[in-house]
């Protein structure tokens, strides 16, 4: 289309103002107009310039407004992440300007599934017109031109779209359909990218589906750390959206619940970091009785139910993704699990620094739910025994093993404090201080270990750790012989 064609003086009411980045700084409005008018008549182009320079220089980006929404979307589909302009290293970035986001198409666009293949666009319009003004209606068709039994409907406001969902979703079963009509918001670009990531993971997981953690691990070495990063990214996105079904479909994650998936991701990150140094490997393989920590929690092969996945197998798959399978055996896999609850003074003494770094890295990778996820793979008997004796107690450990924790969440109790600091060693006491007048937490407390090494591990990993809107401050409690206050 050429910009010289007849057009009104003003753009359409639904026209979109687009922001365009990765534009050569030497390009003028005229150069840009020639580029954009291939897709439709251009109403206005505004190059962003640095006014501090004389004369003002282009910042390499601009705003463009087409006369029609259709032209803007066609330009975006053809240029965004697709075309690299002369002299640039990255493709054009083209998206609606911030001022357009409040009424973005993706917020008003519905996907309609399970519709009769006999329906036309007009039939769909009639069906949904009672909920508000329809901006666009399109039935998806195959190469043969026949309907695929689904459509997209875009309303002029999000409220109209929400009303349509409430009224029409699963409200009727149409002719030739096996289940009720599906009405939901169409996938956004972010949703599509998330599904693409899940597909990539699924393909990689298929490579290891025939391998057994109890047998030959050599076949798992084909995967690298980038797939662990991909998994963590997908986990974070799905956790924030509350949709962990995507992960549940991945082998061998299918039988794990959300908390188990989160724990395994943290453990794999910790093991990957620790395995990169000799001392870290020692810390993994020398933890006392690590296999019992897993097997006593129902993780042995014989105790796995038919509808669940062995946590050790899942752990092995994640360790594989971290590129750390060379020379591993069942003991070393269990040793990695010990990072999440079995580390005592013997494990830390053979690689304290690197293990602390590994734990810190694991926590920071999934910080929004790490604190809640800590106890899941612990030896439950050990957890119960420690809980009875340590929660609420003010018993002190040896010199250098007693911690003062500030900035605890208001709702944290003794048990929460205990569970949060158990991964670093044997806790002899954990106490949150309560205001006697209000009976509410003072948001600080004490934790004591049976050895100073565990206390140092807790400080390095948990000092600055964010829980909600708060960052913990963890430091050693001062000696009784020190006259200074806490």
UniProtKB/Swiss-Prot annotation:
A Pfam family found in this protein is RRM_1
User: Where is the segment annotated Disordered?
Assistant: 277-309
Q: What keywords would UniProt list here?
A: Acetylation, Activator, Cytoplasm, Isopeptide bond, mRNA processing, mRNA splicing, Nucleus, Phosphoprotein, Repeat, RNA-binding, Ubl conjugation
Q: Which GO terms describe its cellular component?
A: cytoplasm; cytoplasmic stress granule; membrane; nucleoplasm; nucleus; perinucleolar compartment; ribonucleoprotein complex
Q: Which residues carry this modification: N-acetylmethionine?
A: 1
A molecular function (GO) held by this record is: mRNA regulatory element binding translation repressor activity
Spell out the post-translational modification annotation for this entry: Phosphorylated. Its phosphorylation status increases in senescent cells.
PANTHER family assigned: RNA BINDING PROTEIN
What the entry says about domains is: RRM1 and RRM2 domains preferentially target UGU(U/G)-rich mRNA elements.
Its family?
Answer: Belongs to the CELF/BRUNOL family.
* Protein name in UniProt: CUGBP Elav-like family member 1
Species of origin reads: Homo sapiens (Human)
């Amino acid at each position: 289309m050429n910009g010289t064609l007849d057009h009104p003086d003003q753009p359409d009411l639904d026209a979109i103002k687009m922001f365009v980045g990765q534009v050569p700084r030497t390009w003028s409005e005229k150069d840009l107009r020639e580029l954009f008018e291939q897709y439709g008549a251009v109403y206005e182009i505004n190059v962003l310039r640095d006014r501090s320079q004389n004369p003002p220089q282009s910042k390499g980006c601009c705003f463009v407004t087409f006369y029609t929404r259709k032209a803007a979307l066609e330009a975006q589909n053809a240029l965004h992440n697709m075309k690299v302009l002369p002299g640039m290293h990255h493709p054009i970035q083209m998206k609606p300007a911030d001022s357009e986001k409040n009424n973005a198409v993706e917020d008003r666009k519905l996907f309609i599934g399970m519709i009769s293949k006999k329906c036309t666009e007009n039939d769909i319009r009639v069906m949904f017109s009672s909920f508000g003004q329809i901006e666009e209606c399109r039935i998806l068709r195959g190469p043969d031109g026949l309907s695929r039994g689904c459509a997209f409907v875009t309303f002029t406001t999000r409220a109209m779209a929400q009303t349509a969902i409430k009224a029409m979703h699963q409200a009727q079963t149409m002719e030739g359909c096996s289940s009720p009509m599906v009405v939901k918001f169409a996938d956004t670009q972010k949703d599509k990218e998330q599904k693409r990531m899940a597909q990539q993971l699924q393909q990689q997981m298929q490579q290891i589906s025939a391998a057994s953690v109890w047998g030959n691990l050599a076949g798992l070495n084909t995967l690298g750390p980038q797939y662990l990063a991909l998994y963590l990214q997908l986990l974070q996105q799905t956790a924030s959206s509350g949709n962990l079904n995507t992960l549940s479909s991945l082998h061998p994650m299918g039988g794990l619940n959300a908390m188990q998936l989160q724990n395994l991701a943290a453990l794999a990150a910790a093991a990957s970091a620790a395995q990169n140094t000799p001392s870290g490997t020692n810390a993994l393989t020398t933890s006392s009785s690590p296999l019992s920590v897993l097997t006593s929690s129902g993780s042995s092969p014989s105790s796995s139910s038919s509808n669940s996945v062995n946590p050790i197998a899942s752990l092995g798959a994640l360790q594989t993704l971290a590129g750390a399978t060379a020379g591993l055996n069942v003991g070393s896999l269990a040793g990695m699990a010990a990072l999440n609850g079995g580390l005592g003074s013997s494990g830390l003494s053979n690689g304290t620094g690197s293990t602390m770094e590994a734990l810190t890295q694991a926590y920071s990778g999934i910080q929004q739910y790490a604190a809640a996820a800590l106890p899941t793979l612990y030896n439950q008997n050990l957890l119960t025994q420690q809980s009875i004796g340590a929660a609420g107690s003010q018993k002190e450990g040896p010199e250098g093993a007693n911690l003062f924790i500030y900035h605890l969440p208001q709702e944290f109790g003794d048990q929460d404090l205990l569970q949060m600091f158990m991964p670093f060693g044997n806790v002899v006491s954990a106490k949150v201080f309560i205001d006697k007048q209000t009976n509410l937490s003072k948001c600080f407390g004490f934790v004591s270990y049976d050895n100073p090494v565990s206390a140092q591990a807790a400080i390095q990993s948990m000092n600055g750790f964010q829980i909600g809107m708060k960052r913990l401050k963890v430091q050693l409690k001062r000696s009784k012989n020190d006259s200074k206050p806490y």
